[in-house]
Amino acid sequence: IGFEYFEISHFFTQWGALHAPKVIASVNGRKKKIFGWDTDASSEEYIKFLRDFISCLLTHLKNLGIEKKCFFHISDEPNEKNLEGYNKAKKSISDLFDGYLVTDALSSIEFYKKGIVNFPIPSTDKVEDFINYGVKDLWTYYCCGQYLEVSNRYIAMPSYRNRIIGTHLYKYNIKGFLHWGYNFYYNQYSRKLINPFLITDGDFFAPSGDAYSVYPGDKGLPVKSLRLVIFNEALQDIRAFKKLESLTSYDYVMNIIENHGEITFKKYPRKTDYIIELRKIVNNEISKFSV
């Protein structure tokens, strides 16, 4: 298919690593839930299982030759109230991941300052705190909470607000971008399936369009949303910026991007033609310097 990198599911529950995720095993030939949200994260039984599971998983990934191309997670979106619990959960398995990339989406810089997380992925409305602190090789993400000022790709948002993310990622040399909602066709907590053609907000739990970027098509093939097409244009903008940079310099490209004012994750031209005209200029500059 062409997949090069692989993301492994979180080993503890979202928002603080308080519990075990749902784990189903074959017991005497029958499927049975052996751990779940009723299991404490520090449970000796769960930690023993988890350590055995991780050891086997890493062996399997090594046999496949992809162990260094995997991203591992502890818990999704912990906050400062979860520092102690998250740290305890991570320490229970961290020795198994020496030399591997362990990262989590989180927006409190205290996790980084205290050395609890070495590779944070902050949200776009908080990432500048990490940039200003000097964190290197940053990734960033957005989801249902990033609805003020910053770029996002909700159905209700104009396309320029979607596409502008390319200039943000380029300016701050962001190494990766994370987004959860590719094809989540369920309501909150996955209690029932929804029809994304008719119900665009996950049955009232997320802004319309947040939970998916493609629609289900014939024979299981995805149908691209306009939002995904525009987001792809943002990625192509980055490629164009990088190409011009290779012919000139980073500062040269940024002078063009910020010709009408400074660009930040929260500050950018709120008009349709800005990014289109910018791309025309960049394309012309590439042609000029490629002669």
Task: Label each region the model flagged.
Residues 1-100, 104-115, 183-188, 259-263:
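Aromatic-lined carbohydrate-binding surfaces of glycoside hydrolases
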Residues 37, 148-150, 221-224:
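General secondary-structure edge motif
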Residues 118-203:
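Catalytic-core region of carbohydrate-active enzymes that cleave or remodel glycosidic bonds
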Residues 189-291:
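Pol beta-like nucleotidyltransferase catalytic core
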